[in-house]
Amino acid sequence: GEQVRIPMAVDGHFWVEALVNGKPTRFLIDSGATMTTVGRNTADLVGLRVSEERNQLVRTGNGVIRMANARAQTLEVGGIARENVRIFVAENDDLNVLGMNFLSSLRRWSVEGRWLILEA
């Protein structure tokens, strides 16, 4: 299968340039996040159809916030592509987070030294 190696950034996190509906989008990879989440600006830029209701209650470090639901036609990291991916949209946050709903679709993922390795 496909393997993608992502180097650890100087901030100690793993950042990746993914394609959402074919458009480049920078994500923080966060195995502590259940769902992949983007900010409203990103959702608009990549053409996500976002639900009107913000009916997803999500617990964050700042308490519980409401988010809207969307689906990406495609979400691609390196050569690993997934279709019809559920994404939460945060109204006031511009941090894009690649969460477990993407990571758990992989055959395997691991951190080895300063590398995150994704295997499809």
Listing of model-derived features with the role each one plays in the protein:
Residues G1-A120:
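Pepsin/retropepsin-fold aspartyl endopeptidases
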